[in-house]
Structures are given as structure tokens and as C-alpha cells.
From Swiss-Prot:
Annotated spans, Disordered: 419-447, 482-504
UniProt family annotation: Belongs to the NARF family.
Function recorded in the entry: Component of the cytosolic Fe/S protein assembly machinery. Required for maturation of extramitochondrial Fe/S proteins. May play a role in the transfer of pre-assembled Fe/S clusters to target apoproteins.
Molecular functions per Gene Ontology: 4 iron, 4 sulfur cluster binding; iron-sulfur cluster binding; metal ion binding
Domain of life: Eukaryota
InterPro entries in the record: Cytosolic_Fe-S_CAF, Fe_hydrogenase, Fe_hydrogenase_lsu_C
Record's protein name: Cytosolic Fe-S cluster assembly factor nar1
Pfam families for the chain: Fe_hyd_lg_C
Lineage of source species: Eukaryota, Fungi, Dikarya, Ascomycota, Pezizomycotina
Length: 597
């Protein structure tokens, strides 16, 4: 298991109060034979029991409610900074030549070569975490990551082959594609008749959070028809990179190794899903083959620091400036190159939130289609529950949506959406009058209990309280203090005094600083803002054009490239295993690259 994942991390930064929804089970103590059962003991003589320490494993707590089986925990442990180093030292880098232009990248590699194309994708929440840790801007954090992954002073400075990453992609780019498709999905669900159930049921629930998906698949299968069918930005980025590069370079997807740097550990689970492999979008193979993951490895913000320390690289000492364009070969398609690496606004604002802005984009898209309409916001029982209503100029509600962050709030949402279950004893009879009255009462109760949930058109659901900037893999305030201490030692200055465990107030203040860094991405950019920013409608139209070009380039329908599926899974947590043991199941899962979901 990744050494950075410890019991202290499993609260997923739910502070100041940590409430585990999985009870800790203890066995009754064996009674001492030396005690007299008839002896009366006074209270002041009762000695406190020395209970064994509670053992909370990844099986218990990652994604909560026993969503992760012990076999899947092993699959997660395979994705760590050690795997990154081992892979970089196991294969030479695929050599690319950009002498002939963007659409015709030449290479001297042979088809049977063992070389690999190393590509990486980085989420904006990771950049915000590093920016806060080292006291730099979000843009400088991106330069730091680029220098580390691809520069001569980073990973290329060491290792067996001096390998680095050929391309480093911002997941914000594919997030914009997911946003445009999400708005289409919601609009179609409101206006289209869907007898074949190709569209999710209303309310549509966002599906970008793997912890939430894991929870729904294993505990509430009745939720699955409501889940958005779209891939997450991480998954969609992996599909694009593997599909385009394998075709353009004439190599198998197995020779393209994709590293994703994400804010939470649950993204490792997402990368292990068998639905997110080349078997979902690639041509039907003539011979049986092992599916290839779209994302080979996921590490978190903290694991990125561990990766640098393992190579003896000081991240803050790297140049905080962009790498020259000569370090990167142009992406092997001109349209996709300009789309993936263009300099434009990220749209990371306080209004859109810290988790990608899915709900905000849906609201602004419908608002743009209804001139004069206004978005009315109403806070729920806490800051992580917010309801939104798009009101027409005449005061009529056009669209209702909501945001639910954190598992406690998610459970409340699930209860609202749970279908009613008639309670009737077998063989019992009711008169027509009483039966009709009971039905009316049941219908009224159902309407009262479910009305606040089922009338939503869209709900943005995230497992972490506060959103993705508060992911379990983000750099903690303790880690930042340790990094500052190490920098003081390197610069031979007096290190800061050792601090006690941060208080809840300090943790909230730290998260607020990370949020501020996340929202300041556009202000940190050196690209001058246009005087007339593109409208939501025109920007979505541009993205649809790029997605259509990708589909035509690959000759694969967009429905296979951008969409995925879910299925009910029975959890084995807390159950007596009568079948194969965990070791056998791990071998089976690993051979299927992410089965077991």
C-alpha cells in the first residue's frame, strides 16, 4: 500500500468534527474465572477496561460505507509514487521527432520496441494545493509541475533512462468538454421522450466523483438510473490521449503510459474500473487480449511531493517559468493540439465552486437560453447544501437544481430519492374506501418527502465536504509546515518552531487559502483577457466541433468515447467469505485490470 496513505488520512479532511458512519465492532471480553459471580462490586472499584485499539483500514473507510473490498484495496496500493519510478526505470522513452510538422510526427521506433510514451494530466485542485504549500501563484505551481515532469532539472535528471513526460495536459480542458455535454444531457432529459432509457432519469446526479459512484453502486443501486452517463475529466482525458496517440503513432495503447495527478485517493478506484479501458471504445479485437486502462496510474498531491523527495528533487528550487516549446513535440493533430494546449480562461470562480462547476455551467447555459431569467440561491441546512432556481422574468421557475457535498448530506439526498415501498401484510384485505384512502395518504406522504428531491433537474454530488479542493490526497497543513522546515534547512536559516497539531480553525483557514488559490487561476495568467469573453453558447458550440473532429479522426462514435456505464455491485465488507480468498480475487482482478466493480 502506498506509504503516504495512513489511518490519519482516512477522515478525508472532514473537520472539525469527524463522524465515521461505519461502527467499530469489538468482541466481548472473556470473563475472568477468578472473580466471584456473587460478589458485589462498588463503582469506585471498577477498573477501566483496556479495549483493543480500533483498527480502521482502507477497506472500512475509503469512500465510506464499506465501498472498497479488501481486493480492491490491493489494486489501489499498486498505484503509488513507487509505481511511477519503477515504470520510468523499466522502459526507455518513446522518441518523437517534430521536424515534419504537427500532423506527421516521425519516429525511429520499431513496432516491437519496449519503449513507452509517457503522458501526464494534472487537475487544477492539485495546482492550488501546491501553490498554497509553497506560497506561489497557481500559474507558478503549473510551471513547477511541468519542470518536474518534463524539464531537464526534474525527473529527466536521474533514473535509469532519464525519462520524462512527453506531454503534460491540464484536465481543465476536458472538463470543459464534460461541462458542454452535461448541459446537453440535462436539456435532453427535460425535452426528450426516452422510451429506450438511453438518458438518465431526473434528477440527473453528477458522476465525476468516484467516491460517490462507489457508494451508489454498492449501497443504493436504485440511484444508478439517475447517474450522469458522462465520463469524468480524468477518464475522458485518458481516453483521448490513448486513442489519438495510439492511432497517430501506430502503436498499441499498452505502450502509452498515462499518469494522472489528482486531489483524492478515490480517483485510483476510478482508474481501476474495467469500463474505463480500451475495450469500451476500441475496435473488437480478433484475439482475446487484456484490456488497457485509459489511466494507468493515479497519484495525489501529497504523493507528488513524495515522488520528488524519492528522486532528491526540491520542488521549490525548480525554475518557476514555462518550459520552452522545444521540450514538447506538437500533439499529432493540429486541431486537438490547439484545443489541449490553448491559453484561455479556466472559469474557476467562487460561483462555480471548487469541484469543476458542473451545476454552475448547467444553470448559466439555461440562463443564456432564457434572456432575462435570474438564478435564485437558497442555502440548505449547512454550507455544503445549496439549492438553485432559475426564475423567468415573470417569476416562474424554469429549472431547479442543487449541490450536495459530503456523505452526510448525500445520505439525506438518497433518502429523498428512495422509491416508496408499500408495507402490506401478505393476505391482508382492505375495503375499497380504506384502500383508496390509504393510497391517497401514501401518495401525499411520498410527495411531501420526495418533492424536495425529485423536482431537481440536476444535482452536483461530491463526497468531500467543501468539494474537491478538500480531497483526501491534498497537501495538509502539517505537510506544508514540514516542507517549510525542510526549505529552511536547505537555505541554512532558522527553521520554524515545531507546531502542535493544527486546530480546526487552522484547518479551515488552510482550506480557505487553497480555495483562494484555486479561484485565482485566471488572475495569475499572463494571457491578457479578451474584452468580450465568449458566451456560454458559442464556447459550447466550439467544444462540440472539437469532439466531433475527435470522433471522426478515430472513426468511433462519440457515445463510445465520452460516455460510460455503471452496475450494481454487492459489497463483501463485513460478510463471511465462503468463496475464493482475497489473494485469489486480487489475482483475478489484476488480470482483468480493474474488474471487481
Amino acid at each position: 500500500m502506498s506509504a503516504i496513505l495512513s489511518a490519519d488520512d482516512l477522515n478525508d479532511f472532514i473537520s472539525p468534527g469527524v463522524a465515521c458512519i461505519k461502527p467499530v465492532e469489538t468482541l466481548p471480553q472473556k470473563e475472568s474465572q477468578s472473580e466471584n459471580p456473587y460478589e458485589v462490586t462498588k463503582e469506585d472499584k471498577i477498573q477501566p477496561e483496556n479495549l483493543p485499539p480500533a483498527q480502521i483500514s482502507l477497506t472500512d473507510c475509503l469512500a465510506c460505507s464499506g465501498c472498497v473490498t479488501s481486493a480492491e484495496a490491493v489494486l489501489i496500493s499498486l498505484q503509488s509514487h513507487a509505481e511511477v519510478l519503477n515504470t520510468l526505470d523499466a522502459y526507455p522513452e518513446f522518441r518523437l521527432s517534430n521536424e515534419s510538422g504537427q500532423d506527421d510526427i516521425k519516429t525511429t521506433e520499431t513496432a516491437d520496441s519496449e519503449s513507452r510514451v509517457f503522458v501526464a494530466s494534472v487537475s487544477p485542485q492539485v495546482r492550488a494545493s501546491l501553490a498554497t504549500t509553497y506560497g506561489i501563484s497557481e500559474r507558478e505551481a503549473q510551471c513547477m509541475i511541468d519542470q518536474f515532469l518534463s524539464g531537464s532539472q526534474g525527473l529527466r535528471a536521474g533514473g535509469k533512462f532519464h525519462n520524462g513526460f512527453a506531454w503534460v495536459v491540464d484536465t481543465n480542458t476536458m472538463r470543459e468538454a464534460v461541462l458542454a455535454l452535461t448541459a446537453d444531457e440535462v436539456a435532453n432529459s427535460l425535452t426528450s421522450i426516452d422510451p429506450l432509457n438511453t438518458l438518465p432519469k431526473r434528477p440527473i446526479l453528477s458522476s465525476a466523483c468516484p467516491g460517490w459512484i462507489c457508494y451508489a453502486e454498492k449501497t443504493h443501486p436504485f440511484i444508478l438510473p439517475h447517474l450522469s452517463r458522462l465520463k469524468s475529466p480524468q477518464a475522458l482525458t485518458g481516453t483521448l490521449l490513448k486513442s489519438v496517440l495510439s492511432k497517430a503513432l501506430g502503436i498499441s495503447p499498452t505502450r502509452i503510459w498515462h499518469l494522472a495527478i489528482m486531489p483524492c485517493f478515490d480517483k485510483k478506484l476510478e482508474a481501476s474500473r474495467e469500463e474505463l479501458t480500451d475495450s469500451a471504445w476500441g475496435p473488437t479485437p480478433s484475439e482475446p487480449h487484456t484490456p488497457v486502462r485509459d489511466v494507468d496510474c493515479v497519484i495525489t498531491s501529497r504523493e507528488l511531493l513524495t515522488l520528488a523527495a524519492s528522486r532528491g528533487i526540491s520542488l521549490p528550487r525548480l525554475p518557476l517559468k514555462p518550459l520552452p516549446r522545444s521540450y514538447y513535440s506538437p500533439f499529432p493533430d493540429r486541431s486537438l493540439d490547439s484545443f489541449l494546449f490553448s491559453k484561455r480562461s479556466s472559469g474557476q470562480t467562487a460561483a462555480s465552486g471548487t469541484s469543476g462547476g458542473y451545476l454552475h455551467h448547467v444553470l448559466t447555459t439555461f440562463q443564456a437560453k432564457n434572456p432575462g431569467s435570474q438564478i435564485v440561491t437558497q442555502r440548505g441546512r449547512n454550507a455544503d447544501v445549496v439549492e438553485y432556481v432559475l426564475m423567468s422574468p415573470g417569476g416562474e421557475p424554469l429549472l431547479k437544481a442543487a449541490r450536495y457535498y459530503g456523505f452526510r448530506n448525500i445520505q439525506n439526498l438518497v433518502r429523498k430519492l428512495k422509491p416508496a415501498r408499500a408495507s402490506r401484510l401478505p393476505g391482508a384485505r382492505q375495503s375499497a374506501t380504506s384502500a383508496g384512502g390509504s393510497r391517497r395518504q401514501l401518495a401525499s406522504r411520498n410527495a411531501a418527502s420526495a418533492g424536495s428531491g425529485t423536482d431537481y433537474a440536476y444535482v452536483e454530488v461530491m463526497a468531500c465536504p467543501g468539494g474537491c479542493t478538500n480531497g483526501g490526497g491534498q497537501v495538509r497543513i502539517e505537510d506544508a509546515r514540514e516542507a517549510a522546515s525542510n526549505m529552511s534547512v536547505e537555505s541554512q536559516t532558522e527553521p520554524p518552531e515545531a507546531a502542535l497539531k493544527p486546530t480546526p480553525h487552522e484547518q479551515r483557514a488552510w482550506l480557505a487559502r487553497v480555495d483562494e488559490a484555486y479561484y485565482s487561476a485566471d488572475s495569475d495568467s499572463e494571457v491578457p483577457a479578451t474584452s468580450e469573453p465568449a458566451s456560454v453558447i458559442s464556447r459550447d458550440a466550439e467544444i462540440h466541433g472539437v469532439l466531433q473532429h475527435w470522433s471522426e479522426y478515430m472513426n468511433i462514435p462519440l457515445s463510445k468515447l465520452a460516455y460510460t456505464s455503471y452496475r450494481e455491485v454487492e459489497s463483501d465488507v463485513g460478510k463471511t467469505q465462503t468463496g475464493p480468498n482475497d489473494t485469489a480475487r486480487v489475482v483475478e482482478l489484476a488480470s482483468k485490470i480493474g474488474g471487481g466493480w
